[in-house]
Swiss-Prot record:
Pfam families with a match to the protein in the record: RecR_C (PF21175), RecR_HhH (PF21176), RecR_ZnF (PF02132), Toprim_4 (PF13662)
Covalent S-S links between cysteines: none
Protein name as annotated: Recombination protein RecR
One function term, GO molecular function aspect: DNA binding
Organism: Lactococcus lactis subsp. cremoris (strain MG1363)
Record family assignment: Belongs to the RecR family.
PROSITE patterns named in the record: RECR (PS01300), TOPRIM (PS50880)
Length: 198
């Protein structure tokens, strides 16, 4: 189908986003074209601002405006527990339940032998280093219930247990193959409460 070049470029840009196919990208492009100039400018400004102003915390790897992040510097957090997640959006999901008061570590992915992603390509080394110099007594592994999430959890458990640190996994109120990001707050709360030792 023929579209003027500016619309075609916009459709292509939207289609690069995860979960956005050609049809949705086309719908978003035409919606954006129909928006008021002020709203388009605000959208563009917010997008550029987020890209420019956010960075990864040098301690936990979470997205933040300041380094270290607000969670790592919060003196009221339980420093004896670290909850390990795949992505920053998982931290947000866990914070919503207001049950967990420890620290976090964001891996930025999972080990995936099928996709050629090794432990060196995710944020594992800094976790191990962090554990060696800390008062951490428990690491809760909260990777997604997928084959890659399970492989990552087992690898982390093998790396951490020799240090004498308790390693637990979120309980299975989460369906196999599901992402933490999409779990409801009650399910997440119960998964943390009933976590299992690995």
């Amino acid at each position: 189908m023929y579209y003027p070049e500016p619309i075609a470029r916009l459709i292509e840009s939207f289609s690069k986003l995860p979960g956005i196919g050609q049809k949705t990208a086309t719908r978003l492009a035409f919606y954006t074209i129909g928006m008021e100039d002020q709203d388009v400018n605000e959208f563009a400004k917010n997008l550029l601002s987020a890209k420019r102003d956010l960075r990864f915390c040098s301690i936990c790897g979470n997205l933040t405006e300041s380094d270290p992040c607000a969670i790592c510097t919060d003196p009221t957090r339980d420093r004896t527990t670290i909850l390990v997640v795949e992505e920053s959006k998982d931290v947000l999901a866990m914070e919503k339940i207001r049950e967990y008061r420890g620290l976090y570590h964001v891996l930025h992915g999972t080990i995936s032998p099928m996709n050629g992603i090794s432990p060196d390509e995710i944020n594992v080394k800094s976790l191990i280093t962090r554990l060696m110099d800390s008062e951490v007594k428990e690491v809760i592994i909260a990777t997604n219930a997928t084959s890659d999430g399970e492989a990552t959890a087992m690898y982390l458990a093998r790396m951490i247990k020799p240090a004498g640190i308790k390693v637990t996994r979120l309980a299975r109120g989460l369906a196999v193959g599901s992402d933490i990001e999409y779990a409801d707050e009650v399910t997440l709360s119960k998964a943390v409460e009933n976590r299992l030792e690995i």
